[in-house]
A protein has these predicted regions:
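Transmembrane beta-barrel strands of outer-membrane/channel proteins
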Residues: 28-34, 118-124, 192-196, 271, ...
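Membrane-embedded beta-barrel scaffold of Gram-negative outer-membrane proteins
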Residues: 189-191, 212-309, 315-317, 338
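Repeated loop/turn-to-beta-strand initiation elements of outer-membrane beta-barrel proteins
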Residues: 23-26, 111-116, 187-190, 277-282, ...
Length: 474
């Protein structure tokens, strides 16, 4: 499959602000945008795909029908005549959004240095999807009975699945913000904030390959029933309804393709510090995030594309700390660390093919590193202005992340890993030359992992890299 997207956007924002250096600082505004987005996303089934995914799936169902009661049910099979099948896909998904917002900050409230910020944003979002997807398939159908001996071929049947229509959704959000900050010196403060976050919903256009396959199966069965004698058609339809519960039901495009907005309440407490006459700058923070209707990206069951789903709710909490030290004119060092504990509070994953309930509640949210860290140092040599070389800087850094879970099941993960990087930078009046190396220890780790069609695929890290950057200023 291949997607081709074209997009146009028009936006406008009008803002009114108070003058600076006032005890009451405020900002009020209105904003809006309209985005046109057209996606052409056809899916092409080549010969193996036709055999395995279209012909194979429905023949497996026919085989199961026969094996459940081989003495009373006939053997049924079909043979797709097309070597290739193309499923078209054309989707227009425009989005309109407008917002009205206000934020006020009251400085030196009650005591000098204490400020309170309160804000509110009212947002309206309207989205729609015009969709068109069709296909065409030619096939033969075979029915074989043991008693009485009977072998009937239905040849040159045709099915033409078609999905065409429009979906519309709109959402209203009220997003408040409240923050307290205390400046106990011009360069040092501590703060507490509470905000409500929002992430837009949308449409899973790649799900249409699933929908069109379901409609294709229905149309193929309808073609068989139209060709079969009336007495035999009733028998075939009864067996199919018994083993294919969704047969005859209207496809629910809205339920299958729409994913809802994600909401979160975010709580943070922290401090910004400048110590030892500015030689040491420190940022400290602790946070808690309560997320509902969490959006999780996953592959569709057939493996033909990815979709976004609302998994349920999750909670995340952690700490972050960063330190930047200017030891002297030549040497500076930095260290940062973050810890995040992010788990699902509720995750209804639906049911398996054997109708078993899937529940990932309590599991770690995938793609969220438990630990992140960075440490680095730079030492610079400065030369006389008359020298052709102005400075030479030597830098080293170490970056790490992990443990990272790749699946909602938490059965595949990447343990903590770190990479060592270095850089030598030569600066002249007009020329800068950087010689750099990344992953100097040639560390092997996984940067991305996903599962589709019952197989796992991983993207490995880049090996040791060396390079030179040259910049000329004129």
């Amino acid at each position: 499959s291949s997607d081709v997207c074209s997009s146009d956007l028009i936006s406008e924002e009008i803002t009114f602000k108070s003058k600076n250096n006032k005890r009451w600082q405020w900002v009020t505004g209105v904003s809006g945008f309209y985005q046109w987005l057209h996606t052409t996303g056809p899916v092409n089934f080549m010969e193996d795909g036709v055999t395995d995914m279209i012909e194979g799936n429905i023949n497996n169902t026919f085989k199961k029908i026969h094996l459940d009661d081989p003495r009373r049910t006939p053997e049924m099979s079909l043979d797709v005549l097309n070597n290739r099948i193309r499923v078209s896909g054309s989707f227009d998904t425009p989005v309109f959004s407008t917002a009205l917002y206000h934020q006020s900050t009251f400085n030196d409230l009650f005591v000098k240095g204490l400020s309170v910020t309160a804000g509110l944003r009212l947002e309206y979002e309207k989205m729609s999807m015009n969709y068109f997807s069709d296909s065409n398939i030619d096939f033969d159908f075979f029915l074989k009975m043991a008693m009485p001996p009977l072998n009937i071929p239905f040849r040159n049947l045709n099915a033409a699945p078609l999905l065409e229509g429009k979906e519309k959704n709109d959402y209203v959000q009220l997003l408040p913000k409240l923050a307290f900050k205390y400046d106990f010196s011009p360069a040092n403060n501590m703060y507490v904030s509470i905000t409500r976050g929002y992430r837009s919903g949308g449409y899973n256009v790649q799900m249409f390959s699933e929908l069109i396959q379901s409609d294709m199966q229905q149309k193929m069965i309808e073609a068989i029933l139209d060709k079969a004698p009336e007495s035999m058609a009733g028998m075939i339809e009864g067996m199919i309804k018994q083993h294919m519960p969704n047969y005859g039901k209207e496809l629910n495009v809205q339920e299958t393709t729409v994913y809802k907005p994600e909401y979160s309440w975010n709580y943070e407490v922290g401090s910004h510090l400048s110590l030892f006459n500015g030689k040491l700058k420190t940022d400290l923070a602790a946070f808690y995030m309560d997320t509902h209707d969490q959006q999780i990206a996953k592959f569709v069951n057939s493996g033909l594309g990815r979709m976004m789903v609302n998994a349920g709710s999750s909670e995340s909490y952690g700490v972050e700390a960063s330190f930047l030290a200017s030891i002297n004119k030549n040497l500076n060092m930095n260290v940062s660390y973050g810890y995040t504990h992010s788990t699902f509070k509720k995750y209804d994953g639906g049911t398996t093919s054997s109708e078993e309930q899937i529940d990932y509640s309590g599991n770690y949210v995938p793609f969220v590193p438990r630990h992140t860290m960075n440490a680095g140092a730079n030492y610079s040599f400065f030369f006389d202005k008359s020298n052709w070389m102005q400075s030479l800087t030597l830098g080293m850094s170490y970056t790490g992340a992990g443990k990272i879970y790749w699946t909602e099941k938490n059965n595949v993960s990447q343990s903590f890993y770190g990479t060592l990087n270095g850089r030598i930078s030569l600066q002249t009046k007009a020329l800068q030359i950087d010689v750099w190396g990344r992953n100097l220890t040639n560390k092997d780790y996984t940067t991305f992992y996903f599962e589709t069609m019952h197989r796992g695929f991983e993207q490995k890290s880049r090996p040791l890299q060396l390079g030179v950057d040259i910049r000329y200023h004129f």
